[in-house]
From Swiss-Prot:
Name this protein carries in UniProt: 3-deoxy-D-manno-octulosonic acid transferase
Taxonomic path: Bacteria, Pseudomonadati, Chlamydiota, Chlamydiia, Chlamydiales
Domain of life: Bacteria
Gene Ontology BP term (one): lipopolysaccharide core region biosynthetic process
A Pfam family recorded for this sequence: Glycos_transf_N
Enzyme Commission (EC) number: 2.4.99.12, 2.4.99.13, 2.4.99.14
GO cellular component labels: plasma membrane
Length: 431
């Protein structure tokens, strides 16, 4: 009891310190980008969320857009088979909230930003909603949220779970903390065997762990719509043009690609730059200007009829817009401090996939993509040659598309396995 109390107090102190360290950056985003204005009351517990109706309640949580989006087939199936349940979906980012509202409010879900995980804030919210099941997407588990839910009798599951090498080392160093942090989870449904070994390394029993594969490979027909013609028309790309979509770009990715793009003087090669964070738009623009690349901004009505390069300064369109690509590159993979983003989205939109050397967040998936030749791993030295070859050889591009489709087909049973495990837990609960 004393140990748990001490752990809770130390955790609170850590969160408070982290907040003050991040405060200048937070206030900068508030005053210059208008972020967090709509969500601060919920975040700080000033305003409590309310869930309508009666019946058992399942609370889903994901860090941001990607983690929340992968819940779509799960919520749809849950609603079909267990219509008496109520849904809550939370996320830590405003972009995630917008995505969750678009996807889930029509299903009757209550969506809001997750309050801060300080014991004095989150515990009262958990007590008010009293969830019967809590489901964390991928790995964004919060200690007080989890432990208070368990104290009230909820079941807690991690789905599509993963644990990075960095996090594993950190929790291994503090093995007792790692065990205490994840031990309240009833089940951990993980992406692969490597993540299983990492969780076991920090003290989680193998009896709690299931490996089902990556749920992001699952495509429901409603989510797999390919809008290639729609986006190419909207971007004003002709049938002779070749489009490279550079998604989730960070400044270091831009630096590498700017050098390559400067070699393309052919007006039929179009480049769409999609920043990961819109607040870094000016930095991206300066890097392109420095490289002598002329570009337009989507928000200002620019199109590929006027420019060979466009910056897509709009949120929430990247996955859809991959469908217009002749080549797709996933950013964050030329920045060792980032380690990559979702490698599957281009495949789901039937675009040839490329990524850089830094893929810590999905290293196992990246290795399997390379083995199946469903994705191309490039570095600074090979990037220009690989891109040039793909642009000039339609057969090669089509071969990567077909291998990507085959890869997804082989992996798509991961959702069904995950659902069957969860369903067995739901049906045996006494609500």
């Amino acid at each position: 009891m004393i140990r748990r109390w001490l752990t809770s107090r130390l955790y609170d102190a850590f969160l408070v310190c982290a907040f003050f360290v991040s405060a200048p950056r937070i206030f900068y985003k508030v005053f210059f980008h208008g972020k967090y204005i709509d969500s601060w009351k919920i975040r700080f517990g000033v305003q409590k969320p309310f869930v309508k109706g009666e019946g058992p309640l399942v609370w889903f949580h994901g860090a941001s857009v990607g983690e929340v989006s992968l819940l779509a087939p799960l919520l749809n199936r849950w609603r079909e088979e267990f219509p008496e349940w109520r849904f809550v979906v939370t996320t830590c980012s405003e972009a995630g909230v917008h995505t969750a509202r678009r996807l889930y409010e029509s299903l009757g879900a209550t969506v809001f930003v997750l309050p801060l995980d300080l014991s004095c804030i989150i515990k009262s919210v958990v007590r008010k909603l009293a969830p019967d099941i809590v489901i964390f997407s991928e790995g964004d588990c919060w200690l007080h949220f989890l432990t208070e839910s368990k104290r009230l009798g909820a079941k807690a599951f991690l789905i599509n779970g993963k644990l990075s090498e960095h996090s594993c080392k950190r929790f291994s160093f503090l093995k007792r903390l790692g065990r205490n942090y994840f031990a309240p989870l009833d089940l951990l449904i993980l992406q692969d065997e490597l993540y299983k070994q990492r969780f076991m390394q920090i003290g989680i029993s193998s009896d709690k762990i299931h490996v089902t594969g990556n749920m992001k490979t699952f495509i429901e027909s409603s989510l797999a719509t390919n809008r290639r013609d729609f986006w190419r028309a909207k971007l004003q790309i002709s049938s002779q043009d070749r489009l490279i979509v550079l998604g989730s770009m960070h400044p270091k990715d831009v630096e590498v690609w700017a050098e390559v793009v400067s070699h393309f003087h052919n007006s039929s090669t179009k480049i769409l730059w999609v920043p990961r964070h819109l607040e870094k738009l000016k930095e991206h623009a300066k890097l392109l200007e420095k490289a002598g690349i002329l570009f337009g901004l989507w928000s200002q009505g620019a199109s590929f009829r006027q420019y060979n390069s466009l910056i897509m300064d709009a949120m929430g369109v990247l996955k859809d817009i991959y469908s217009a690509a002749d080549i797709a590159f996933v950013g964050g993979t030329f920045d060792p401090s980032v380690g990559g983003h979702n490698l599957l989205e281009p495949l789901q939109k039937e675009a040839p996939l490329m990524f850089g050397p830094y893929i810590y967040s999905q290293s196992v998936l990246a290795e399997r993509l390379r083995e199946k030749e469903a994705g191309l791993s490039v570095n600074k030295e090979t990037l220009l040659d690989v891109v040039t070859d793909l642009l000039q050889n339609e057969k090669n591009r089509q071969a990567y598309i077909e291998k990507g489709k085959s890869f997804l087909k082989q992996e798509e049973n991961s959702f069904q396995q995950t659902w069957e495990i969860l369903k067995s837990q739901i049906t045996c609960m006494k609500i």
